[in-house]
Amino acid sequence: MGQFAVILAAAGRSTRFGDPKQKKIYAELEGRAVWLRALDPFLTHGEVEQIIVAIAPEDRELFDRRYHDKAAFLNLDVIDGGAERSDTVARALERVRPVCQFVAIHDAARPCLTENMVSAVFSAARDHGAALLATPVSDTIKRTGDDRFTSETVPRRNLYLAQTPQVFRRDWLEAAYARRAQAGADVTDDTQLVEALGHRCVIVPGSTLNLKLTTQEDLKLATAILRLQSNFPRETSGHPFADEAAMWADLPKLKASDLFDP
Protein backbone atom coordinates (compact mmCIF):
# COMPACT_ATOMS: atom_id res chain seq x y z
CA MET A 1 0.00 0.00 0.00
CA GLY A 2 1.28 3.46 -0.90
CA GLN A 3 2.33 5.94 1.77
CA PHE A 4 1.91 9.12 -0.25
CA ALA A 5 -1.06 11.42 -0.67
CA VAL A 6 -0.93 13.87 -3.57
CA ILE A 7 -2.60 17.28 -3.46
CA LEU A 8 -3.07 18.82 -6.90
CA ALA A 9 -3.43 22.57 -6.43
CA ALA A 10 -5.92 23.51 -9.16
CA ALA A 11 -7.76 26.50 -7.68
CA GLY A 12 -5.74 29.32 -9.27
CA ARG A 13 -7.23 32.24 -11.15
CA SER A 14 -5.12 32.08 -14.38
CA THR A 15 -5.16 35.87 -14.67
CA ARG A 16 -2.10 35.98 -16.96
CA PHE A 17 -3.11 33.16 -19.30
CA GLY A 18 -5.03 35.48 -21.58
CA ASP A 19 -7.97 33.23 -22.45
CA PRO A 20 -11.28 34.71 -21.29
CA LYS A 21 -13.11 31.47 -22.07
CA GLN A 22 -11.24 29.09 -19.79
CA LYS A 23 -8.46 28.78 -17.23
CA LYS A 24 -5.13 27.32 -18.24
CA ILE A 25 -5.56 24.05 -16.34
CA TYR A 26 -8.62 23.23 -18.46
CA ALA A 27 -6.91 23.99 -21.78
CA GLU A 28 -6.31 21.01 -24.05
CA LEU A 29 -2.74 19.74 -24.20
CA GLU A 30 -2.09 16.89 -26.61
CA GLY A 31 -5.68 15.73 -26.36
CA ARG A 32 -6.13 16.01 -22.59
CA ALA A 33 -6.71 18.81 -20.12
CA VAL A 34 -3.58 20.33 -18.56
CA TRP A 35 -4.60 19.28 -15.04
CA LEU A 36 -4.94 15.65 -16.15
CA ARG A 37 -1.50 15.78 -17.75
CA ALA A 38 -0.12 17.07 -14.44
CA LEU A 39 -1.56 14.02 -12.69
CA ASP A 40 -0.23 11.41 -15.13
CA PRO A 41 2.98 10.40 -13.29
CA PHE A 42 1.12 10.01 -10.00
CA LEU A 43 -1.64 7.85 -11.47
CA THR A 44 0.86 5.14 -12.40
CA HIS A 45 3.12 5.43 -9.33
CA GLY A 46 2.87 2.50 -6.94
CA GLU A 47 3.52 4.56 -3.79
CA VAL A 48 0.56 6.90 -4.28
CA GLU A 49 -2.36 6.00 -2.02
CA GLN A 50 -4.61 9.01 -2.56
CA ILE A 51 -4.97 11.94 -4.97
CA ILE A 52 -6.86 15.07 -3.93
CA VAL A 53 -7.72 17.63 -6.62
CA ALA A 54 -8.53 21.05 -5.16
CA ILE A 55 -10.42 23.25 -7.63
CA ALA A 56 -11.82 26.76 -7.44
CA PRO A 57 -15.41 26.74 -6.15
CA GLU A 58 -16.54 28.75 -9.17
CA ASP A 59 -15.23 25.97 -11.44
CA ARG A 60 -17.32 23.24 -9.83
CA GLU A 61 -20.10 23.21 -12.44
CA LEU A 62 -17.63 23.16 -15.33
CA PHE A 63 -15.48 20.50 -13.68
CA ASP A 64 -18.40 18.20 -12.93
CA ARG A 65 -19.78 18.60 -16.42
CA ARG A 66 -16.49 17.86 -18.19
CA TYR A 67 -14.60 15.60 -15.83
CA HIS A 68 -16.93 13.93 -13.34
CA ASP A 69 -16.70 10.51 -14.99
CA LYS A 70 -12.91 10.70 -15.37
CA ALA A 71 -12.46 11.77 -11.75
CA ALA A 72 -14.69 8.94 -10.54
CA PHE A 73 -12.89 6.37 -12.69
CA LEU A 74 -9.49 7.54 -11.39
CA ASN A 75 -10.78 7.55 -7.79
CA LEU A 76 -9.88 11.21 -7.29
CA ASP A 77 -11.09 13.17 -4.27
CA VAL A 78 -12.24 16.50 -5.73
CA ILE A 79 -12.69 19.33 -3.24
CA ASP A 80 -13.20 23.09 -3.31
CA GLY A 81 -10.05 25.08 -2.73
CA GLY A 82 -9.66 28.41 -0.97
CA ALA A 83 -9.00 32.02 -1.89
CA GLU A 84 -5.20 31.62 -1.70
CA ARG A 85 -2.94 28.68 -2.43
CA SER A 86 -2.20 28.09 1.25
CA ASP A 87 -5.94 28.05 1.97
CA THR A 88 -6.36 25.42 -0.73
CA VAL A 89 -3.62 23.19 0.67
CA ALA A 90 -4.99 23.58 4.21
CA ARG A 91 -8.40 22.36 3.08
CA ALA A 92 -6.88 19.43 1.21
CA LEU A 93 -4.78 18.42 4.22
CA GLU A 94 -7.97 17.86 6.18
CA ARG A 95 -8.96 15.19 3.64
CA VAL A 96 -5.73 13.17 3.64
CA ARG A 97 -6.35 9.57 4.64
CA PRO A 98 -4.87 8.38 7.96
CA VAL A 99 -2.72 5.74 6.24
CA CYS A 100 -0.71 8.37 4.33
CA GLN A 101 2.58 9.28 6.00
CA PHE A 102 3.79 11.72 3.35
CA VAL A 103 2.05 14.46 1.39
CA ALA A 104 3.12 15.69 -2.05
CA ILE A 105 1.85 19.02 -3.36
CA HIS A 106 1.94 19.67 -7.09
CA ASP A 107 0.84 22.55 -9.30
CA ALA A 108 -1.93 21.63 -11.73
CA ALA A 109 -0.23 23.96 -14.22
CA ARG A 110 2.92 21.77 -14.43
CA PRO A 111 1.90 19.15 -17.02
CA CYS A 112 5.36 17.89 -18.08
CA LEU A 113 6.37 16.15 -14.85
CA THR A 114 7.69 12.60 -15.28
CA GLU A 115 7.42 9.54 -13.07
CA ASN A 116 11.19 9.49 -12.62
CA MET A 117 11.07 12.99 -11.16
CA VAL A 118 8.31 11.86 -8.81
CA SER A 119 10.28 8.81 -7.69
CA ALA A 120 13.37 10.92 -7.01
CA VAL A 121 11.59 13.49 -4.86
CA PHE A 122 9.57 10.78 -3.04
CA SER A 123 12.79 8.96 -2.17
CA ALA A 124 14.44 12.15 -0.89
CA ALA A 125 11.39 12.96 1.26
CA ARG A 126 11.51 9.50 2.84
CA ASP A 127 15.19 9.98 3.65
CA HIS A 128 15.10 13.59 4.85
CA GLY A 129 11.50 14.40 5.79
CA ALA A 130 11.01 17.14 3.20
CA ALA A 131 12.10 17.51 -0.42
CA LEU A 132 11.36 19.56 -3.49
CA LEU A 133 12.34 19.72 -7.13
CA ALA A 134 14.35 22.83 -8.03
CA THR A 135 16.74 24.07 -10.70
CA PRO A 136 19.87 26.21 -10.19
CA VAL A 137 19.57 29.87 -11.12
CA SER A 138 21.55 30.42 -14.32
CA ASP A 139 20.68 34.01 -15.23
CA THR A 140 22.23 37.04 -13.57
CA ILE A 141 19.90 38.43 -10.90
CA LYS A 142 19.52 42.16 -10.27
CA ARG A 143 17.97 43.81 -7.25
CA THR A 144 16.27 47.16 -7.84
CA GLY A 145 14.52 49.84 -5.88
CA ASP A 146 10.89 50.75 -6.44
CA ASP A 147 12.09 53.01 -9.28
CA ARG A 148 13.45 49.92 -11.13
CA PHE A 149 17.02 51.22 -11.12
CA THR A 150 19.51 48.51 -10.16
CA SER A 151 20.94 48.59 -6.66
CA GLU A 152 23.01 45.39 -6.70
CA THR A 153 23.78 42.16 -8.49
CA VAL A 154 22.77 39.18 -6.37
CA PRO A 155 25.30 36.32 -6.26
CA ARG A 156 23.58 33.32 -7.79
CA ARG A 157 25.69 30.64 -6.12
CA ASN A 158 23.44 28.26 -4.19
CA LEU A 159 20.29 29.96 -5.49
CA TYR A 160 17.55 27.71 -6.88
CA LEU A 161 14.19 28.11 -8.58
CA ALA A 162 11.63 26.06 -6.67
CA GLN A 163 9.32 23.73 -8.56
CA THR A 164 6.78 21.12 -7.57
CA PRO A 165 6.18 18.47 -6.38
CA GLN A 166 7.13 19.48 -2.88
CA VAL A 167 6.90 16.49 -0.55
CA PHE A 168 6.78 16.39 3.25
CA ARG A 169 6.30 14.16 6.21
CA ARG A 170 2.65 14.51 7.00
CA ASP A 171 3.21 15.50 10.63
CA TRP A 172 5.67 18.22 9.62
CA LEU A 173 3.27 19.68 7.07
CA GLU A 174 0.29 19.57 9.41
CA ALA A 175 2.30 21.29 12.14
CA ALA A 176 3.45 23.93 9.66
CA TYR A 177 -0.09 24.67 8.56
CA ALA A 178 -1.29 24.81 12.15
CA ARG A 179 1.07 27.78 12.59
CA ARG A 180 0.39 29.29 9.17
CA ALA A 181 -1.02 32.54 10.55
CA GLN A 182 2.32 33.31 12.21
CA ALA A 183 4.07 33.23 8.83
CA GLY A 184 2.15 36.28 7.60
CA ALA A 185 0.43 36.85 4.29
CA ASP A 186 3.48 36.53 2.02
CA VAL A 187 3.61 32.72 1.78
CA THR A 188 4.61 31.66 -1.73
CA ASP A 189 5.20 27.94 -1.31
CA ASP A 190 4.85 25.13 1.19
CA THR A 191 8.53 24.69 1.98
CA GLN A 192 8.47 28.21 3.39
CA LEU A 193 6.04 27.11 6.11
CA VAL A 194 7.97 23.94 6.92
CA GLU A 195 11.25 25.87 7.09
CA ALA A 196 9.65 28.24 9.61
CA LEU A 197 9.40 25.28 12.01
CA GLY A 198 13.14 24.70 11.74
CA HIS A 199 13.01 21.77 9.31
CA ARG A 200 15.38 21.67 6.36
CA CYS A 201 14.08 20.72 2.92
CA VAL A 202 16.47 18.94 0.57
CA ILE A 203 16.58 19.95 -3.08
CA VAL A 204 16.29 17.27 -5.74
CA PRO A 205 17.64 18.35 -9.15
CA GLY A 206 14.64 19.42 -11.19
CA SER A 207 14.32 20.13 -14.87
CA THR A 208 13.56 23.15 -17.00
CA LEU A 209 11.17 20.82 -18.82
CA ASN A 210 9.00 20.77 -15.69
CA LEU A 211 7.70 24.21 -16.56
CA LYS A 212 4.73 25.96 -15.01
CA LEU A 213 2.25 27.26 -17.56
CA THR A 214 1.55 30.97 -17.28
CA THR A 215 0.80 32.19 -20.81
CA GLN A 216 -0.56 30.59 -23.95
CA GLU A 217 2.98 30.56 -25.36
CA ASP A 218 3.88 28.23 -22.48
CA LEU A 219 1.16 25.89 -23.72
CA LYS A 220 2.95 25.63 -27.07
CA LEU A 221 6.23 24.88 -25.31
CA ALA A 222 4.56 22.21 -23.18
CA THR A 223 3.22 20.61 -26.36
CA ALA A 224 6.75 20.42 -27.73
CA ILE A 225 8.08 18.94 -24.49
CA LEU A 226 5.42 16.23 -24.34
CA ARG A 227 6.11 15.27 -27.95
CA LEU A 228 9.82 15.06 -27.23
CA GLN A 229 9.19 12.94 -24.15
CA SER A 230 7.05 10.66 -26.29
CA ASN A 231 9.86 10.26 -28.83
CA PHE A 232 12.50 9.72 -26.15
CA PRO A 233 10.88 7.76 -23.30
CA ARG A 234 12.70 8.00 -19.98
CA GLU A 235 14.06 4.84 -18.40
CA THR A 236 14.51 4.07 -14.74
CA SER A 237 18.24 3.32 -15.01
CA GLY A 238 20.69 6.06 -14.09
CA HIS A 239 19.68 9.32 -12.49
CA PRO A 240 16.18 10.48 -13.44
CA PHE A 241 17.25 13.31 -15.74
CA ALA A 242 20.16 11.66 -17.52
CA ASP A 243 18.40 11.64 -20.86
CA GLU A 244 17.62 15.36 -21.09
CA ALA A 245 20.75 16.21 -23.03
CA ALA A 246 19.98 13.50 -25.56
CA MET A 247 16.43 14.75 -25.91
CA TRP A 248 17.48 18.29 -26.68
CA ALA A 249 20.38 17.17 -28.87
CA ASP A 250 17.88 15.42 -31.10
CA LEU A 251 15.51 18.37 -31.24
CA PRO A 252 16.83 19.68 -34.60
CA LYS A 253 15.76 16.39 -36.20
CA LEU A 254 12.15 17.37 -35.59
CA LYS A 255 10.46 19.86 -37.89
CA ALA A 256 9.14 23.05 -36.37
CA SER A 257 5.75 22.16 -37.81
CA ASP A 258 5.82 19.01 -35.68
CA LEU A 259 6.00 21.10 -32.53
CA PHE A 260 4.11 24.32 -33.08
CA ASP A 261 1.11 25.38 -35.09
CA PRO A 262 1.95 27.96 -37.74
Give the location of each predicted region:
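SAM-dependent methyltransferases
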Residues: 1-5, 190-191, 208-210, 219-262
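N-terminal glycine-rich phosphate-binding loop and ensuing alpha1 helix
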Residues: 1-61
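Structural beta-sheet core signal
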Residues: 6-8, 53, 105, 130-133
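Residue-level signal for inorganic ion chemistry
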Residues: 8, 35, 92, 106-107, ...
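Short, high-confidence coil segments that cap the C-terminus of an alpha-helix
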Residues: 48, 100, 126-130, 199, ...
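Conserved donor nucleotide-binding strand/loop of the catalytic core
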Residues: 71-83
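Active-site nucleotide-sugar/metal-binding loop of Leloir-type enzymes
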Residues: 87-102
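Conserved core of the sugar-phosphate nucleotidyltransferase
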Residues: 112-204, 243-262
